[in-house]
Swiss-Prot record:
Disulfide bonds: none annotated. This is Peptidyl-tRNA hydrolase. Belongs to the PTH family. Gene3D superfamilies: Peptidyl-tRNA hydrolase.
Amino acid sequence: MVVVGLGNPGPRYAFTRHNVGFLFLDFLKSKDWKTEKYFAWSRIKLAGNDVALVKPLTYMNLSGLAMPHVLKFFNASPDDIIVVYDDVSLKLGRIRIRKKGSDGGHNGMKSIIQALGTQEIKRIRVGIGDKPEGMDLVDFVLGEFSDEEWIILNKVFEVMKEALEVILIEGTEKAMSIYNSLEVRV
């Protein structure tokens, strides 16, 4: 399995809502990352399996540019990939696991679907909450989590790690049935 977390490179974006994919991978493994031309990567053991972690080094909207290089490097196919990214339409504390689907308006996922030529890509969408009324969407997704939101997010990351283990052991359908209805609260 190759877990691809989406985000924007650089310290300016490091802790923003839009970088929740990168943040999750850092939760799984905070050090010992290696860098290729188009992506950073590391490996972990999860449920007894070797799992590659990948952060595209392009900006979010160009995430797909890294994907052919990721597939070649890991000798993988689109079926081996699970993409983790933010979803403004999901409440903070919720995740949505899917086996396939459209980009749902997410430009990073849109770029990956275009690059791989298929919508049949597993994904975990991570709720980042509703933007406050009157706030620009870009300002919201490029804003940082509050201290209270971090408490929830760290619990969400624990749940997501469990969900990945279920995907590895029992399959995506089983993980969907367990985790898509859960809501993490403080």
